[in-house]
Structure formats: C-alpha cells, structure tokens
Amino acid sequence: MNNTDELLAGALAGDLGPRPADLVATSVFWLHHGTRLAGGNTTYLNQYVLVRQGGSFGACAFEPGEVDAAICRDASGASLDTLLREAPRPLRIAALDAYLSAVSPHREAAGAEPVTLPAGTPETRALARDAAIAGLLDIEAGAKVGLIGVVNPLVAAIRKRGGDPLLCDFNLRTTQWGDPVTDDMHEVLDTADAVVATGMTLSNGSFDTVLARCREREVPLVVYAQTGSAVARAFLGAGVTALSAEPFPFSQFSADATTLYRYRAVAAA
C-alpha cells in the first residue's frame, strides 16, 4: 500500500473486507472543542467529524470551514460507499476509519498493545498519553525528532526520551517554552533522524507526503492518531514504524481510565 488513495480504492473494491455499498453510516456527527492545559499558554482548538458504523467509530479532524454542521443530517444513514466516493475529504477519512475499525477493531487486533491511561485530570491524562507515544521512539540521545502536529506535553516527552525536537505545526508558532515552530514540514522531514506525526495529517493529505519522505530517507515514522487511527494502521510496516492508536471516545472526553493501542512494525527477517 503506497498511499491513502490506494487504500481507499481497495476498500471501495471490497478487497479489504465487506463491500461498503452494503454498510450504512448509522450516525455522522461532529465535535468542536477547546483545551488549555494548566501551566500552558496555548488553547488547542479541534474539530472532528465522526462516523458510526455498526460497532465501530471513525474520526477525522478538520480545519474551520471545511465541514458544515448540516453534513450530520445529510450523511447520517448514507451508505459507506457513498461517503467514501463523494464526501469531503475529512468525512471520507472518517468513513474509511470506521470501515477499517469494523473490519479489525483495535481491541481485537493482533499486535496491538493496550495501554491504560489513568483516571484523573486533563493534565494527568495528557502526560500519560504523550509518554506512551514517545515510548514508541527508538532513538539515541541527541537524535533530531521531527514532530508534525505540536502539543506541549509531547514535546516534553520527546525531550525526556533524549530527543531534540524539530517542530512543525500549521497553527502554532512557539511552544510554551519558546521553541520555534515552523509551518513548513519539509524543513523537518529533510533533516530529522526520526519523525512523529499526528493523524491529523490524513485530513489535509499531507500524510502521504510524510510517508513518502520517510520511506525515501529510511527514517522511522511514528504516528499518533485519534484521526484515522485504523487508516494509519494500514501503513504499519509500509513506511509507518509504530503507531499510537486512540479510538473514539478520545481521552480528552473522559476523566475515567481509557485505553489506547500501541503497534510496532515487525522487522523483516
């Protein structure tokens, strides 16, 4: 599998599981929320569109203005085939994520390592989540770690692992510690010894660029995904070295213990 277009085509053809034309998106909904963690100076604003199909959910973040709330009315009850072919990209990714999650739920997937995030405050849960993500990095002290999609606790977790973060985000210009953040991901992809990328890159199509560049340079790629966690999983061992998959409901929407799933690509013999 080379890119998300090939994955989408495989799903539509029924090569990956049931025919999407036979499956229905029971519920399509969206979430818009803000978060400012204690001690931070950044308010994170996120929008997600979500698809419920059978026993699974699929999710994709989107930028303001990309998806209108009316889509919840118009798309609920549609076939997955229709959404995968005709919907705006964020909804297509959410539908594909729901489809792949139904075919192979994270809780049942071979190779998935469940990690329990403890009950507690947003800060406690964010620190635990980002430590779990950074724990997927296999790096030497001082390694340059490209981070595409910047959240302050993850920057701190990478540093704790001994990495030197190279930061890229489309909406953030500095961290709470004053680290510069570029909006040009090629500055990061061309120099990093390892890359950590958010699943949100699936929303705007930049995931394929990140994937291809990491393959070309033969550098490890760790994906942390609420957006498209099952979509990113499809590239495990094909450019993605490791994955932290967090299916809906996400950790920020609960104060109780929740589970994310870590995957590592199996090395070739």
Regions found by a protein language model. Give the residues of each.
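Short acidic low-complexity segments
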Residues: D179-T191
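A short helix->loop->beta-strand "cap" motif at the edges of active sites that frequently abuts
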Residues: G162-G163, E216-P220
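Short, conserved loop/helix-junction motifs that constitute active-site signature segments
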Residues: L189-D190, A212-E218
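NAD(P)-binding Rossmann-fold cofactor-contacting core
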Residues: G162-T175
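Electropositive, gly/pro-rich neighborhoods at or near active sites that engage anionic ligands
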Residues: M1-N152, T258
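A short acidic, amphipathic alpha-helical/loop segment
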Residues: A157-I158, S206-R213, A234
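C-terminal functional extensions of proteins
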Residues: P220-A269
